[in-house]
């Protein structure tokens, strides 16, 4: 009976450690994602569009890993705006349409409105 109790305690401890590990890992990824988005916005405002694209692209990759749809839509939207500023309208529309799709899935009306305004200014 003591062995069964010991094995049960070990399993519970192991399960607790796994939960703790994944929570810490998720928190780290969220912090990294926030930092990437912030750096992208800073560079976009400073006019460093190519550098901003790199940050937003990395942020987009993180959103796929973490299934963070809200940040995914924002990263796509920002990449669309950058391509618009660079005069690459086809790429801009592609990213903005992708962002629109995610905003629609999330039923984010504010996000949808800003994408609509951006796409109308391209047409």
Regions found by a protein language model. Give the residues of each.
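TPR/TPR-like alpha-solenoid helical repeat scaffolds
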Residues: 107-123
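Flexible helix-coil transition and linker loops at the boundaries of alpha-helical arrays
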Residues: 25, 63-69, 104-106
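Residue signature of alpha-solenoid helical repeat architecture, marking inter-repeat boundaries
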Residues: 27-31, 70, 110
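TPR/Sel1-like alpha-solenoid repeat signature
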Residues: 36-39, 43, 55, 62, ...
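Long, contiguous interaction/recruitment modules in multidomain scaffold/adaptor proteins
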Residues: 1-31
């Amino acid at each position: 009976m003591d062995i069964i109790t010991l094995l049960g305690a070990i399993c519970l401890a192991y399960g607790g450690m796994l939960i703790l590990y994944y929570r810490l890992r998720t928190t780290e990824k969220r912090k990294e994602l926030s930092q990437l988005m912030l750096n992208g916005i800073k560079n976009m405002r400073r006019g460093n569009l190519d550098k901003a694209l790199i940050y937003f692209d990395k942020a987009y990759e993180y959103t796929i890993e973490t299934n963070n749809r809200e940040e995914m839509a924002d990263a796509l939207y920002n990449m669309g705006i950058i391509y618009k500023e660079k005069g690459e309208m086809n790429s801009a529309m592609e990213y903005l349409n992708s962002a629109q799709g995610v905003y629609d899935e999330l039923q984010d009306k504010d996000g949808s409105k800003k994408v609509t305004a951006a796409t109308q200014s391209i047409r």
